[in-house]
Structure formats: C-alpha cells, structure tokens
A protein has these predicted regions:
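Core segments of cupin and vicinal oxygen chelate
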Residues: 11-55
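Short glycine-enriched loop/turn motifs at secondary-structure junctions
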Residues: 4-6, 69-73, 110
C-alpha cells in the first residue's frame, strides 16, 4: 500500500493576486518560507515553500467570496514546534500589521493546544499552532493505533 509521507502542496485561489502576494509575503516570511513565481497556461502563480510543502496562490476565475462554512476548506493550520514559537510568530505578524487573535491556550481542543488565528485578504482562515504531545504520540505510534 502507498504510504503518504506528507502534503506536497496546497493551491489557494485568490481574488487579487497582487494583494494576496503582499499579505503572504509577510506571513510566510515570518514562518521561514521561500518564494518563487511561475506560470501555468499563461496564468501567474506565486509559490511559498519550505522543506515540508508548497503553498501556491493562483488567480480566481469567478468572483464568489470564500465561505468557510460552505463545502471546501474551512481553515488551514500551520504547525510550529512550540507554544513559544506561536507567540513569536504572533508578535512578528502584529509588528508587520497583520491583525490576529491573541496567542493563547485552547484547553477545549487539547490541554497543550496553543494557537493564533487570523485571515487572509479573501477571508481564508489561518492558524499557527504548536506541535502538541497528543499529535507527537499519534505520529510516533500511528501504526499501533486502531484504524
């Protein structure tokens, strides 16, 4: 059976590529991503990438607004290692003018769940969260867990 070893890339369709690129230039730089540009069928694309995956912006074809409660993507959570790194990212976003929630613990999700939430220019909800103990245990022992 094939073994999925990670998420290779995510494509996000945006209403204004230049506006979204300015936003993601800040967010992804805070998180250590690099950037390149390319075209597919004459359409410009902007890709942010690190050693784990690529996050690609592409221009919209229709003008329907994003609705996180319609079928499709609700939000994207990017994981950093520690709660301290969540706080650092939130601080850096605030310094660069990106509005976000206060970084804090969310015990209703998990006892060590720490996160900051914000939205991109099209309303796509984004989260930066820590690598929680429950996740570490699941990742380390996934073959022994019940399917």
């Amino acid at each position: 059976m094939p073994d999925v070893i990670g998420i290779d890339h995510t494509y996000v369709t945006v209403s204004d590529l230049a506006r979204s690129e300015r936003f993601y230039d800040v967010v992804m730089a805070v998180l250590g991503f690099r950037k390149n540009r390319f075209q597919i069928d004459g359409e410009p694309h902007v890709q942010y990438y690190n050693r784990h995956f690529g996050y690609v912006l592409r221009p919209q074809h229709t003008s329907a607004p994003h609705d996180p409660y319609a079928p499709g993507l609700h939000h994207l959570a990017l994981r950093v290692n520690t709660a301290g790194e969540v706080k650092d990212a939130a601080h850096r976003l605030a310094e660069r003018g990106i509005p976000a929630s206060d970084p804090k613990q969310y015990p209703e999700y998990a006892s060590d769940y720490f996160a900051v939430f914000f939205s991109d220019p099209d309303g796509l909800r984004l989260e930066i969260t820590n690598y929680r103990q429950e996740r570490r245990e699941r990742h380390d022992n996934w073959k022994n867990l019940e399917p």
